[in-house]
Regions:
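Short, charged/polar surface micro-motifs in flexible loops or helix N-caps
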Residues: 22-24, 34-37, 53-54, 89-90, ...
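Residues that scaffold the ATP/ADP-binding catalytic core of kinase and kinase-like folds
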Residues: 39, 55, 143
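Charged phosphate-binding loop/patch that engages nucleotide di/tri-phosphates or the phosphate backbone
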Residues: 133, 137-161
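Alpha-helix-centered segments that form part of catalytic cores
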Residues: 122-138
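Short, solvent-exposed loop/turn elements at beta->coil junctions and helix N-caps
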Residues: 3, 80-87
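Active-site-adjacent beta-strand/loop module that shapes the phosphate/pyrophosphate-binding cleft
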Residues: 84-121, 133, 155
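N-terminal strand-loop-strand
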Residues: 2-47, 96
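The catalytic Nudix box helix
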Residues: 47-82, 136
Length: 161
């Protein structure tokens, strides 16, 4: 419950892994798994993130979600606070960025189960993240969920300081 007595809005915490390559900032984005996302690309990619309970520290949740979705622990190092954004459906995403490197070919995501095909009565298991990829900031802005694009701009500003 929120302090006002109502239900707390859904909140997610995420961690953007970034690196500088050839003078350009690159970010590691993830693509959601499952049949509903299989043919979507532009606007479908995201930072590794997930919901967390009210009693969990958001940065700890971001690090946990990174490990769950990529199968690799979040890198140690300074976490740059990128603030919050509100997604279209109202979910608030708080994010941090950490410098590091990860080979996208090595990711192993946690999974989820859903009925597929719809109304078939059969369930299938799918990876929460079906792939990860490094993008320069300009291409990342085209691929990422539009509500999360502000996080990329904040990262650019933080790195340029």
């Amino acid at each position: 419950m929120s302090p006002g007595g109502g239900a707390r809005s859904a909140r997610s915490a995420g961690l953007i892994l970034f690196r500088c390559s050839g003078g350009e900032v690159e970010v590691l984005l993830v693509h959601p798994g499952g049949p509903l996302w299989a043919k979507r690309d532009h606007g479908a990619w995201s930072i590794p993130k997930g919901e967390y309970p009210a009693d969990e520290d958001p940065l700890s949740a971001a690090r946990r979600e990174f490990a769950e979705e990529l199968g690799s622990p979040a890198p140690d190092g300074e976490a740059i606070d990128l603030g919050e954004v509100r997604q279209k459906a109202g979910k608030v995403v708080c994010a941090w960025a950490v410098a590091g490197d990860l080979d996208p070919a090595t990711i192993t995501s946690n999974t989820f189960t859903m009925q597929w095909p719809p109304r078939s009565g059969r369930t299938q298991e799918f990876p929460e993240v079906d792939r990860a990829q490094w993008f320069g900031l300009s291409e990342a802005r085209e691929r990422i969920n539009p509500a999360q694009a502000a996080l990329l701009e904040r990262l650019r500003e933080a790195v340029e300081r």
